[in-house]
């Protein structure tokens, strides 16, 4: 997963451990991606999964196996456990976070709205995104990528579901608004420096991450019609304030 911004002096500290590089669109293609997602004519739950996957930029299994019980509506948080309760006949449903520590995803107003729409369809079930043919199971691991292919993307060369993480990471970094610690924490990356890892593990940076996730959702909204760079958008906000 490549996540580097020339706008930042990272001093070798901003080093994601995920060495496999997944295809990701350049941020300039955001308006096209958002338009194609809005116009996706397949299953409605799949469209919601696409939208939330981009808003949350979590790993595929973290979203696929998500349960309604993990959503804290009052605090506007999605709390992903390090391990989930195994559901009978659902392979790997015990999987929680990849890093084996609880991960908090602050819910933007946009994410809350989509989750409410999703709840109307699957709120009576365990999984937020149930399978299309068996609602006791979760959506398949290929659902998002299949939808991207239907939307006209080559998931081997242009964009895959994991590529949303690189896009979000690039935008947050290039905006110049957020600390690398808060970005790393929200990306749920493993810090290689053991001393620094212990510090970051204790420091949640939650207040900054709440603001950051709302900024990301607002930034996506800003890009629905034409491309605005993260740095430009951050500048507009500074001028407005």
Where are the regions a protein language model picked out?
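Short, basic (Lys/Arg/His-rich) helix/loop patches that form interaction surfaces
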Residues: 35-46, 105, 117-136, 142-185, ...
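Catalytic-site neighborhood detector that most strongly recognizes the C-terminal catalytic loop/helix
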Residues: 16-19, 24, 80-87, 112, ...
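Major-groove DNA-contacting interfaces characterized by cationic-aromatic clusters
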Residues: 14-20, 110-146, 156, 197-201, ...
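Conserved tyrosine-mediated DNA breakage-rejoining catalytic core shared by Y-recombinases
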Residues: 6-17, 65-117, 191-194
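Long, amphipathic, Lys/Arg-enriched alpha-helical "connector/arm" segment
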Residues: 8-45, 55-58, 66, 83, ...
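C-terminal catalytic core of Y-nucleophile DNA break-rejoin enzymes
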Residues: 19, 23, 87-116, 125-148, ...
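Short, charged phosphate-coordinating catalytic segments
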Residues: 1-6, 53-79, 178-182
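Short amphipathic alpha helix immediately N-terminal
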Residues: 48-51
